[in-house]
């Protein structure tokens, strides 16, 4: 449903590819920090997850 609203996958990939060349250093740093934050949160969730006891 989201893809239909935003366009096809090819269009999104093409836009992302074109935008990568135009990233300012500040925006690039922000994206990198965001990705690292998400990875860190996923790792913590995986490491701290436990089976519920019945």
Curated annotation (Swiss-Prot):
TM helices/strands, residue ranges: 31-48
Region (Required for DVL/RTFL small polypeptide activity): 20-51
Residues bearing attached sugar chains per UniProt: 26
Chief place of localization: membrane
One of the GO biological process terms: negative regulation of cell population proliferation
Protein name: Small polypeptide DEVIL 12
Species for this entry: Arabidopsis thaliana
GO cellular component terms, semicolon-separated: plasma membrane
Annotated localization: Cell membrane
Keywords: Cell membrane, Developmental protein, Glycoprotein, Membrane, Transmembrane, Transmembrane helix
Membrane topology summary: Single-pass membrane protein
Keyword Membrane: yes
Record flagged with keyword Transmembrane: yes
Sequence similarity: Belongs to the DVL/RTFL small polypeptides family.
Biological function: Small polypeptide acting as a regulatory molecule which coordinates cellular responses required for differentiation, growth and development, probably by restricting polar cell proliferation in lateral organs and coordinating socket cell recruitment and differentiation at trichome sites.
């Amino acid at each position: 449903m989201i893809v239909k609203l935003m366009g096809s996958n090819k269009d999104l990939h093409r836009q992302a590819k074109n935008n990568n060349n135009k990233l300012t250093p500040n925006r690039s740093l922000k994206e990198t920090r965001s990705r690292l934050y998400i990875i860190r949160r996923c790792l913590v969730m995986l490491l701290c997850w436990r089976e519920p006891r019945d």
